[in-house]
Amino acid sequence: VTLSAEELYTRGLEHVNAGRFGAARRALTSGAARAVDPDLRARIAGTRAFLASHDGAPDSAESLCRDALALDGISAQTTAILQGQLGLIALNRGNPSGAVSSLTSGIDAMPESSGRRARMYLNRSVAHMQLGELAAARGDLDRAIADYEEDADPDSAAVAEHNLGYILLLEGDLVGALGHMVSARKVMAGESDVHTAIGDVDRAEVLRDAGLTTEAERLLEAAIHVFGARRMRQAQAESELNLARSLLRHDPARAAKVAAAAERRFSQLEGALWRARAAGIRARALLAGGTVDRSGRVTPAARRVPDADTVGGLAAELDGHGLWGDAMALRLTHILWRVRHGRDDGTPLPRLRRSAPLEVRLLAYEVRAARAATPTQARRAAARGLDELTTWSHSFGSLDLQTSLAMHGNGLLGAGLAAAVDTGDPAAMFEWSERARLLSQQVVPLRPPPDPELARRLAELRTLRAELPADSWLSDPRAAELGELVRERQWASVAATDAPDGGDRVDLSGLQRLLDADTAALSFVFSPHGMRCVVAGAGCAEVVDLPGWSEAHTLLPGLRSDLDLSASVRSGPMADVIRRSLDARLASLSRLLLEPVTARTAARRLLITTPGVLAGVPWSMLPDLRGRVTTHAVSASRWARRRTPLTLRTAGFAVGPRVARGIEEVTTAASAWQRTQPEIRHGADSTIDGVTGMVGAVDVLHISAHGRHTADNPLFSGLELADGVLFGYDIDRMPRVPTTVVLSACEVGRSAVRWGEEAIGMTRAWLHAGARCVIAAPVVVADDDACELLGAMHEGLAAGTSPAEALADATERTGIVAPFQVHGAGF
């Protein structure tokens, strides 16, 4: 059957709307050859122009539109459509002002409300966003949604809702932004892989700004592949630019390469504005190398960096395009590079606008800190920047979000810590160690109301985890989708309130007033200058240098495998070999990290705070801490607020499947609590709901179950119960959490370190939710050791001994040296 030109045009539009651009191109080419009516020829030309623009041929696209506008006999509606198409072409070429002009002409010429007019409102809103005119952008989106609803087009209305989320992102409301985008994705995702990729690119920006760069970059790389396969060069290049911006924070060398690829692609597309943006990111990436990050890694320095003339010219070009935020970030990055390399010429800092993006404001504070004449001035500048970051992040109650937002403060933390170390003053170093630890602890979560939808999604995730390979289950498309929905739901539902007692930092003298003669605080501080420890007692404080840090750092990567092997291989000829290897490694770590420190204090009780670079160290197994009582706090300030004596009257126990001596372990432990008739759940009774219900009724919760730490998404770490895995996300659903939690499980004492100080995992999730103390191990623990040691520990807990004292006493009585350690306010 031979299709008419009108039918081919209709089919071409259907293909375009579904993202099938190759099929659309063929249908429209045939339609153009058969069209006689000038109005139809013009409409076909307009749609072909859209495809040409997507194919990277903006000149051809513009010519198609202007030639069509010159035809006699075209309708007002077609004229409006062509003006709208010219606006979209201008938008893709990086000319938002021209786009607004053409789109306004198209909107004014459109005779009545329709889907086409709504699409022009949608595109004009994007142009307003690029110009920073967010109120105008929001107004256009509201008009677009009204037109789409009148036209009964929910799919297009979802696109508008998604863009409302992008406006919230630009306004700094990450939670609201992700909420709109996830809601829109439910409708958009079914359209095509192109629609899904378009939405994913914007969601990746939200995740990047939230510090979740791994997830953001995974989405962007997938989108780049989709756009490349569909020959959508503009969208592909924009996604590469976004990927480079994300990599800039942690992999500047790769960021420079990706930005260069985007720059080349934009040059081919003749998009001057977009090319300048990519060139700016590439220049910043080249200037960002050669620093020590918060994990102790030295980022490689670029062989060649842009000189002052290149930076000045590029910044001026960005200014000319109205991208003053990009220009300012580039200028500040260049000044910072010059200061760090001893080439500062005293160029005054550019004047910031009140509306400057947070990234630019924080960069300015970092430059002021680097240029400061004295360490005191440097600390003051860095502190002001961190206070501004804290004000922005204050409303976020989610642990997932709080810990990741610390990304934005990394440079300022490094500057402040380095300045504090330069003084050699224990009080200054302690203050900045607390600033680093408290950056993600300024607020605590309000307990959310019951959420059946979140519960349903977590239940489906439990089923998927049971069915899929343990090491890759979150890569499954459905699991990944559910994980994103759970994250959005949890971000939105967990509000924040001030931390107890206002969340104030305790200073060194304030901490010392809380220490008795037999208690000391060890605050390990990592900075670009290395590792040091502030040792504080009731009447004295000093800074201890740890010159062996570099050697200790090389011992950490093999530590976990030694610990896991030692717990798994308990007999046979290899057991002694493995044990000797582990003992040697632990002795070396103790000598390098603790011997210089413990030589300064005879205190039996030690409050220990550590940076993320020391995550995973089994402190309780290090020889220099034998015979001492230790508690490992998120921060000394939080310990100070929660150190009041515990009153533990009731206990509950749960055993997961396939734990060899699990029932024996909890039965032995529960015998210490017989006067209160402790609840014990095992077998089919040890369910998610059963344990969750028990949690609210006990002071001490002890779970003996197999556990697994999920590094890519630590809040999907969990404990295996009878009907699935209890995730970290489940903890925020609990109306009340116990005072003390004992996790006798493989790995769940581990944490994934995000951006330096703040670790996240099951242990941190319980503490964040309100538990005073968590007893857990960062590695595999032999079932025999867990059974005997924890049973003895419960005797102390039931007798009123503090958790840290109870664990230390149990270790001494049983002679078992295991990696269990006390987190939080253990004494």
Walk through the language-model features, giving the residues of each.
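Amphipathic alpha-helical protein-protein interaction segments
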Residues: 301, 308-312, 323, 343-350, ...
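Structural signature of alpha-solenoid helical repeat junctions
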Residues: 3, 40, 78, 116, ...
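Amphipathic alpha-helical segments of tetratricopeptide repeats
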Residues: 29-33, 66-71, 104-111, 142-153, ...
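Residue register of alpha-helical TPR repeats
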Residues: 6, 43, 81-83, 119-121, ...
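Catalytic-core domains of enzymes
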Residues: 544-547, 551-562, 581, 601, ...
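Cysteine protease catalytic core and zymogen-processing segment of caspase-like enzymes
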Residues: 623-639, 671, 708-772, 826
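An often Trp-containing, charged/polar helix-loop segment at the C-terminal end
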Residues: 786-827
